[in-house]
Amino acid sequence: MKVGLTYDLRSWYLDRGYSMEDTAEFDKQDTVNSLDNALRKMGFETEQIGNCFQLIDSLSAGKRWDLVFNIVEGLYGDGRESVVPAILDQYQIPYVFSGPVILGISLNKYLTRLIVSAAGVPVSPGMLISSGQDIQKCNLQYPLFIKPVSEGTGKGINEKSLLNSPAELKEMAEWILARFNQPALVEEYLPGREFTVGVIGSGDDAIAIGGMEIECRDNLPYSVEFKENYREFCKYIPMAKEFSEECKTVALNVWKALGGVDGGRVDVKADRDGRMCFMEVNPLAGLHPIDSDLPILSRMIGIDYQTLIEMIMRSAIKRHKLVL
């Protein structure tokens, strides 16, 4: 079986003038090489295709693959993560991880909240701020937390994201609207402990494999700077047994409500009463073997990188009914 790899190589974009923040979600070459090596160890023939532009060029040149391992995040628009899966769907080429609808919804944190809340998953009270007029309508209980509605990797989150007054809300909401050209999601702040949970599989076969607790220095928010320099700013701690079942239940319910497939992460945090609430879902979780959250938490529970990739691939192969 021939497996293609699609990805956004960070250096490719940096060479073309994009900033470190613009490319925060993109991959290093060693991530791609590690994936490639893991797939080859499974006996697959592989090809490193590249980003959506390079995929289009390859398809136009007549290239095809039996399966594509897709980790492209995209750069433009609120459907940027959906571009590669949509292209592959048109060519009837199966791929690893979720399709365009799920990726599009999951990138929008407000739409995701609506779906998981309707499925009975606890969420913190919140609202969407799309204009200056919406700021005046906010009647949530302070402190609040604010972030761009459709960014990942902590982009748009900083030490000012925790809000204690209407004046702070106005300042940060106006900054997000101007800086990111998208609405802001405002939620009542969850003061409890924060966890990220790994989920592997699809549908009834999906399992929450385990998680880890995230502690940031001085209790500051988990920003893009902290994620880039997590060894300096953060502590990753194996999830205590007393929180494990509740966190895993929330994560699995979120995954199934959204229709996630093959693998990803779900972030949860405790409210003031200790109840675990949904924060975010990542159906395109980072897969750097050393520095990405899903491989880190997997190692904590005894799942090495090779085994993790094999679990993800088994899910995709079964889901697409492929014959090896």
State each model region's role.
Residues 46, 94-95, 123, 144, ...:
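Hydrophobic beta-strand scaffold residues
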Residues 213-264, 293-324:
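Active-site "cap" helix and flanking loop/linker of ATP-utilizing ligase/carboxylase catalytic domains
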Residues 188, 198-199, 255-290, 298:
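Conserved metal-phosphate-binding beta-hairpin within the catalytic cores
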Residues 19-24, 158-163, 295-297:
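Short glycine-enriched, charge-decorated loop/helix-capping segments at active-site entrances
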